[in-house]
Amino acid sequence: MSQFSFTKMHGLGNSYIYVNMFEEQIPEEDLALVAEKVSNINTGIGADGMILICPSDVAPVKMRMFNNDGSEGKSCGNGLRCVAKYAYEHKLVEDTVFTIETLAGIVTAEVTVEEGKVTLAKIDMGAPRLTRAEIPMLGEGETPFIRENFLYNNHRYAFTAVSMGNPHAVIFVDDVEQAPLTTLGPVLETHEMFPERVNVEFIEILNEEEMNFRVWERGSGVTQACGTGACAAVVASILNGKMERGKEITVHLAGGDLMIAWTEEGNVLMKGPAEVICRGVYEYKIEA
């Protein structure tokens, strides 16, 4: 029987099991199965996945994230805010501004601290990727993929594709509560045009500075929030002429609000909370 200490944290209800790999050891070959086991709501702790906080050669810390199906993702906005909180509060970093390595690249985090606790984290998510090769999508072309039709159940849905280090398909609807989240979501997620699968967002524009947001996450299904998805939604809204670049947009997710801005300089900034749920020790056994 093996075990490791963990901290369960959430960003707007998007919860992960966080493991400090500066102190813990999980064999590389076991990571996918451990992520699946620990995320199981019935036989594990229950979460949207597992995130490892690891040493890095190019930044103070490195984030590796695994979905609850065991697949490894390249980035996670809500996860990055929680990693920033953990790293600062556990003295893995000294300054309130620092970098975090991800499989999608290096991002910059800035934490707001009150009485030694991080109350808010802002992440510079970098520039969005908009070509088919960068997303990735099948097909050729260097222009952004904006409002292309997808036929499902005799209805045409127009989506815009954006990568924030992971792929997103953003669909505008009149009412997110009536959106085909659990039906169209998994169909588009696994469509052959997306070789690495895709996260699917449904967006309801409220005004020039607010939107409602629901998400079907690649490898996790319906979740309360998706930070990279919120970033992709704002980028897609600006590409479609629905919002103005440079303004801070309030994204209303099922779990709460994020503040997102696509700056004139090109990067996307995400600001929001990160919370600790509980801490403990998880025991597991890998069958031979």
Curated annotation (Swiss-Prot):
Key words of the record: Amino-acid biosynthesis, Cytoplasm, Isomerase, Lysine biosynthesis
One Gene Ontology CC term in the entry: cytosol
Cytoplasm in keyword set: yes
GO molecular function, one term: diaminopimelate epimerase activity
EC top class, as a word: isomerase
Predominant location category: cytoplasm
One record GO biological process: lysine biosynthetic process via diaminopimelate
Disulfide-linked positions: none
Binding site for substrate: 14, 67, 77-78, 166, 199, 217-218, 227-228
Listed pathway(s): Amino-acid biosynthesis; L-lysine biosynthesis via DAP pathway; DL-2,6-diaminopimelate from LL-2,6-diaminopimelate: step 1/1
Superkingdom as given in the UniProt entry: Bacteria
Its EC number(s): 5.1.1.7
Catalytic activity line of the entry: (2S,6S)-2,6-diaminopimelate = meso-2,6-diaminopimelate
Subunit relationships: Homodimer.
Function comment: Catalyzes the stereoinversion of LL-2,6-diaminopimelate (L,L-DAP) to meso-diaminopimelate (meso-DAP), a precursor of L-lysine and an essential component of the bacterial peptidoglycan.
Similarity remark: Belongs to the diaminopimelate epimerase family.
Name of the protein in its database record: Diaminopimelate epimerase
